Amino acid sequence: MGAITFSHIGFHVRDIEKMERFYTGLLGLTVTDRGPLDTPLGRLPFVFTSSTPQEHHQVVLAGGRPDHVPFNVINQLSFRMEDFATLRALQRRLPEF
């Protein structure tokens, strides 16, 4: 099986400005991109951040999380793999967990 590396994580947040201040001010991430994107929930603000110029984004903040809707704030956890065969090998191992 080939190498698997972390790619990025996305959070659906209520207050995107506050979360941007947290990730940039406290954790030292840099905003690499921003803007509204069309989603199944409508057009939402996004902020892409990274700790390294080699990565467009490592932490993605998606605004528009409703206060009254209880759901998981982690939208995705993404990894990179060397090839599709690595993904298939990982898929075969899932029942072990």
Model features per residue range: what roles?
Residues 1:
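A short, basic/flexible loop-to-alpha-helix module at the beginning of a structural domain
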Residues 4, 14-17, 77-97:
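Vicinal oxygen chelate
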Residues 6, 59, 71-74:
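Short, structured motif recognition centered on aromatic/hydrophobic residues
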Residues 8-10, 48, 76-78:
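Short aromatic/hydrophobic contact patches that present stacked aromatics
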Residues 11-56:
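Core segments of cupin and vicinal oxygen chelate
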Residues 37, 75-76:
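Short helix/strand-bridging catalytic loops that position acidic/His residues to coordinate divalent metals
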Residues 54-56, 68, 84-87:
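Short, charged/polar surface micro-motifs in flexible loops or helix N-caps
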Residues 62-67:
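Short beta-strand/turn micro-motifs at beta-sheet edges
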